[in-house]
């Protein structure tokens, strides 16, 4: 197993493809993302963005080609890759009856974060995602923007090297979009985020990867 966690390349694909019978979901994607880059994965709905992200995170096996996170082939190192990434799917599930603080405590335990680090990790993600004012409110009663930030805090708990976010501002009102963009820009992580909104790209990303009909443009 090769570990290039100290390399500049944090996300890498080569010839990555996914087929469903005769249907081409994603075909021959080759790209790389360097440490510290925030990259927008831009394309219309149905372009193949979510399929690609699921292959990068190990939730979906590619038909052909390879995906690497921190130098590790995803297909061969799913557990280790899961420790290196924070994955925020579009409309990711949250326990709406829980409060943000109870949810963060629950997932800190579920991820076996050491007791000596648990409080400081939770405090750090609360600060990163600006959740101080809603910690004890039921998640189901929070605005969509705050719920998205709770989701971000959750995937940051284990201090991943790479963040993969699928449409992180989808369905938010303009003020919520600004809040989530500010949070993303302040994280200082290697981030791949998908969007179908061109105007959003310069506000949050360093560069763009364009995809349409499952192929890079």
Where are these regions (language model features)?
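Conserved beta-strand-loop-alpha-helix hinge in the C-terminal portion
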Residues: 215-217
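ABC transporter nucleotide-binding domains
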Residues: 8-13, 18-212
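Pre-NBD coupling/linker segments of ABC/ABC-like ATPases
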Residues: 1-7
């Amino acid at each position: 197993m090769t570990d290039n966690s100290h390399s500049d390349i944090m996300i890498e694909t080569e010839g990555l493809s996914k087929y469903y019978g005769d249907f081409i979901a994603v075909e021959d994607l080759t790209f790389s993302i360097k440490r510290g880059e925030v990259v927008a994965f831009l394309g219309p709905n149905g372009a193949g963005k979510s399929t690609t992200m699921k292959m990068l995170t190990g939730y979906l096996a590619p038909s052909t080609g390879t995906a690497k996170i921190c130098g590790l082939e995803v297909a061969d190192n799913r557990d280790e890759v899961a420790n290196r990434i924070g994955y925020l799917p579009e409309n990711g599930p949250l326990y709406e009856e829980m409060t943000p603080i109870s949810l963060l405590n629950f997932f800190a335990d579920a991820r076996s974060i050491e007791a000596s680090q648990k409080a400081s990790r939770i405090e750090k993600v609360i600060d990163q995602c600006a959740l101080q004012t809603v910690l004890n409110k039921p998640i189901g009663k929070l605005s969509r923007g705050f719920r998205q930030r709770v989701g971000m805090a959750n995937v940051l708990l284990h201090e991943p090297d790479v963040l993969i976010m699928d449409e992180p501002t989808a369905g938010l009102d303009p003020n919520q979009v600004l809040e989530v963009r500010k949070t993303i820009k302040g994280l200082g992580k290697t981030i791949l985020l998908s969007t179908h909104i061109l105007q959003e790209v310069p506000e949050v990303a360093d560069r763009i990867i364009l995809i349409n009909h499952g192929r890079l443009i």
